[in-house]
Regions:
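ATP/NTP phosphate-donor binding region
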Residues: 1-77, 255, 274, 298
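Short beta-strand segments
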Residues: 14-16, 88-90, 113-116, 148-154, ...
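Internal gly/pro-rich beta-alpha loop/helix module
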Residues: 114-187
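Short Gly/Thr/Asp-enriched flexible loops that form oxyanion-binding sites at enzyme active sites
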Residues: 88-110, 249-258
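A glycine- and small-aliphatic-rich helix-loop capping segment at beta-alpha/alpha-beta transitions
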Residues: 27-36, 94, 100-112, 128-134, ...
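Short acidic, glycine-rich surface-loop motifs adjacent to enzyme active sites
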Residues: 80-95, 234-245
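Accessory alpha-helical/coil subdomains and C-terminal extensions
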Residues: 5-10, 14-21, 34, 40-46, ...
């Protein structure tokens, strides 16, 4: 039974496809569930005010920045028309990146909650219905207001800037390694345990400028010499380097990265999966101190994928190296 408080909330539900909406294969391809189908599978949603928008059905690896920002604008219009919260269902492969992109630009107090599923509805024990119910309850909870974009799966509530997909198949694949979840859904009630501070939202860039801003990502590996890095500026306006541990690269790479940093913004992140890039602990060639001295921008706690999202947005605004560095100091 829905509490009177939640029954008064009005939630806009947008569907983007993904595992949560897979309904088996036909000769014509994969059959997709509509938003109405998803809601019908969760009887507890029957008493809530839901506005269902079947935006598009696309595998999450095919989602683009433009599509995500278009969705943000659609969701903004829904909030301006009276929706008190937003829920988006999508595939989980890129969910951590789309959630962070949304969080960077979402200007409203209304919660923007993203969810999905690891087991599709044709399998035993699909997790989509429970995840959708928890996401809607979170979007309808007054305590979730002002928290920006949230990711809700497995009855855990994660801040978009911290969440990672950490397992390829587990229903408990989403985690926030640096901070843990900020809340839980317990016996149907949303419990927010931590309220992370929010940064001022960035404006949505012009689509043409966004299309022209391309960011490469290079993950450093053992005995890496990456001769192609010199060619990166020919087709990209920025580069993210996923370095070892606290932000290190082989010493042989350091001069080339320093040269690149004089031509385009180069952000240094860690490939480790959690923890921060350091600033002034190690001093050898290829260390974080050396690379910053050569002009690389410290990504802080942002992982390589989120660093790429933020850098691309900033480049679409025409940000120079100094501006990029200032924003990463705030977000990282």
């Amino acid at each position: 039974m829905t509490s009177p408080m939640l029954a008064d909330e009005r939630i806009a539900l947008f569907t983007l496809g993904g595992t949560i909406a897979m309904a088996g294969h036909t000769d014509a391809g994969v059959r997709r569930l509509t938003g109405a189908d998803l809601v019908a599978a969760v009887p507890a949603l029957g008493d809530l005010q839901l506005e269902v928008h079947d935006t598009r059905a696309v595998p999450s690896p095919d989602l683009t920045f433009t599509q995500v920002l278009d969705l943000v604008e659609e969701a903004s219009r829904a909030v301006e028309a009276g929706a008190t919260g937003v829920v988006v269902t999508q595939g989980t492969d890129t969910l951590e990146e789309t959630a962070f992109l949304v969080d960077l630009v979402w200007p409203h107090e209304a919660p923007f909650v993203l969810t999905g599923a690891m087991r599709n509805p044709t399998l035993a024990g699909p997790d989509g219905p429970a995840n959708l119910l928890a996401a809607v309850r979170t979007a309808a909870a007054p305590t979730a207001r002002g928290l920006g974009a949230l990711v809700v799966l497995n009855d855990e509530i994660h801040a978009a800037r911290s969440v990672r997909k950490t397992h390829s198949t587990s229903t408990a694949s989403f985690a926030s390694p640096n901070s843990g979840p900020i809340g839980h859904v317990i016996e149907g009630h949303v419990r927010i345990l931590v309220r992370p501070s929010r940064r001022e939202p960035l404006p949505v860039p012009p689509r043409a400028a966004l299309a022209a801003a391309r960011v490469a990502l290079h993950t450093v590996t053992l005995d890496d010499h990456a001769p192609y890095l010199a060619e990166v500026p020919r087709m990209h306006q920025g580069l993210v380097v996923a370095g070892f541990g606290v932000g290190h690269v082989p010493s042989a790479l350091a001069p080339a990265l320093g040269d690149l940093a004089q031509r385009i913004p180069v952000v240094l992140a860690s490939r480790a999966g959690s923890g921060s890039v350091l600033r002034q602990t190690y001093g050898a060639v290829g260390s974080e101190t050396d690379l910053q001295r050569r002009g690389l921008i410290n990504g802080g706690l942002l992982d390589p994928y989120k660093s790429r999202v933020l850098l691309r947005l900033l480049l679409a605004f025409g940000a120079d190296r100094t501006a990029v560095s200032d924003v990463f100091a705030l977000h990282g």
